[in-house]
Structure formats: C-alpha cells, structure tokens
Amino acid sequence: MSEHHSGFVAIIGRPNVGKSTFMNRILGEKIAIMSPKAQTTRNKINGIYTTPDAQIVFVDTPGIHKPKNELDTYMDKAALSTLNQVDAILFMVEADEEKGPGDGYIMRQLAEVKKPVYLIINKIDLVKPDDLLPLIESYQHDYAFAQVFPISATMGNNVDELLTALTDALPVGPQYYPEDQLTDHPEYFVVGELIREKILELTRDEVPHAVAVQVERMKDREGGKLQIEAYIIVERDSQKGIIIGRGGQMLKQIGIRARHDIENLLGDKVNLKLWVRVQKNWRDNNAYLKSLGYNTKDLR
C-alpha cells in the first residue's frame, strides 16, 4: 500500500488571475466565488481535494493589491499571513499579461518564506505557445521556483499534472478531513459568498466593492425547504437603490440566481429572503468589519 501524503497549499497572486476558478476546477464544485471584477475573494477559503493517496487543502487567498481602506488592508494581511502556515505555495499569474509591479511585490514577499513556490501560469488557452517561454524566463530571472506549470483553469490543461507533482512533494501525513468534505467553512459563509457573487455579476462597477452579505439565519427545513435570511450591506442610499432596482427587479434577480447555486451546493430546496441595509463607510469601520468576520488584529 502506498504512503498517504497530505498538506496545505496556498494559492497567491494579483486580483483576477483565476485563483478561485482553479480551485473550483479541482474540487468539481463552486465553493469560491468568481467574477471578472477585482477583489472578489475577501477571506481565505479552504478547498479540500481528496484522493485515495492524498489530501491537499488548498487555501484560496484574496488578491494582493495596494490597500485603499481597512477592508483592503485585511485582505492583504489575510493573503500574506498564509505564506508561513502552509507546506507549499502556488504563485499564479496570467499568460496574457506581462509581469507587473504587483507581481514583483509578491515575489519580494515570497523571498522571506522558506517554502517551495510553484509558478502557475494560468489562461494559456488565450495565448500562442511561443509567447510562453519569454514570460516564464522573465519570472525565473527574479525567483527560483520549484517548478513551473502553464495551465488553463477554465479548460483544465495541465491541472492533473500539477496535482500529481504537489501530491509527490507534500509530506507523508494523515487525512485531516472526511473524504466527502470540500471545505472547512460553515455553510452560512459559502451561502453568503454565493449571494455576493450574483451581486457582482448583475450590478454596476461602483457597487461591488462596497457590498457585503451577512447571513442572519438558516432555519431548519420547513415544508421541505431550507429557510435562509440575509442582509446585503452597502455604503450609500444610491447603492441600495441599484441593488433593489426598479420595482424590486434587481433584488429579485439576485435572489433567483443565488438560490439556484445554493440549492445545487446544498442539495435542498431553498426559500431565500434578502434585505438591503445601508451602513455608511463600513469598509473603514473596524468594529463593523469584525461583525462581518473580518478582523485584521487576528493577522498581526
């Protein structure tokens, strides 16, 4: 019988390089929300990949960027604090983007960490193969990566090869979670993230960064349905108006789309009730951030 390998692997990179898409591809389920808008992921999200020979806990981190408010500071600290707590690190970049200052900043942070770092070049389906080598060389000039994997998280190219390499590199260890468990986050957290994803998909650019979702209640099933009640938090009355929409149509569409994904995730029929609440400047209010589950003091 072969030895069982297990460990924790951080996925790090600039906003919007495809970290959440990659993790959802591996798990075969949507537990990390996805959007073309930056700053989609706000918390560290653990995804659990299990085979007979290994268990890899992937930590999908917020995209690292220059902070503009207390929430941004929390997200950067959440991402960087992960680096010393894992067995390996995946540094993800985009095949169709040149190396930028943000990538250089991340590599300088990685230089302080004594863990193997894998360069993951995502979105190779968007470029010609001949364009990859110069990009790889530009990154290797700045950092000694353990290995380089060009992949497509959307199409699945080279993802299996990466998983094999990670399995071989991780230490011999136990299975930390049951084989059918995909995340260690509670259901209400994932439900809130799925609601927020639909807001990102449907609303204008000025709204998404100012939105949070607070799941107030997930009641026992009544009449065969799970009762979920949640508040959508915004900073201004004008944003509340956008979320609700004319005649409540936008809020209705958010609810319909979110309910569909929540039902797929939980395997139950859902009755979803949504309200919109204005909390001015909540992204700079440490007490309110803490009530939503963000606490920068925990990351010092």
Curated annotation (Swiss-Prot):
The keyword Ligase belongs to this UniProt entry's keyword annotation: no
KH type-2 domain segment(s): 203-280
Residues holding GTP: 13-20, 60-64, 122-125
Pfam families: KH_2, MMR_HSR1
Disulfide bond annotation, renumbered to this chain: none
Segments for region (G5): 151-153
Chain residue ranges for the region called G2: 39-43
Main location: cytoplasm
Membrane topology: Peripheral membrane protein
CDD domains tied to this protein: Era, KH-II_Era
Region (G3): 60-63
Record's keyword terms, sorted: Cell membrane, Cytoplasm, GTP-binding, Membrane, Nucleotide-binding, Ribosome biogenesis, RNA-binding, rRNA-binding
Region annotated G1, chain positions: 13-20
SUPFAM superfamilies: P-loop containing nucleoside triphosphate hydrolases, Prokaryotic type KH domain (KH-domain type II)
Gene Ontology CC: cytosol; plasma membrane
Gene Ontology MF terms in the entry: GTP binding; GTPase activity; ribosomal small subunit binding; small ribosomal subunit rRNA binding
Domain Era-type G stretches: 5-172
Entries under NCBIfam families matching the protein: era, PRK00089.1, small_GTP
HAMAP family for this protein: GTPase_Era
Function per UniProt: An essential GTPase that binds both GDP and GTP, with rapid nucleotide exchange. Plays a role in 16S rRNA processing and 30S ribosomal subunit biogenesis and possibly also in cell cycle regulation and energy metabolism.
PANTHER family assigned to the protein according to its UniProt record, in alphabetical order: GTPASE ERA (PTHR42698), GTPASE ERA, MITOCHONDRIAL (PTHR42698:SF1)
Record text on subunit structure and interactions: Monomer.
Similarity annotation: Belongs to the TRAFAC class TrmE-Era-EngA-EngB-Septin-like GTPase superfamily. Era GTPase family.
Protein name, per record: GTPase Era
The species this protein was found in: Lacticaseibacillus casei (strain BL23)
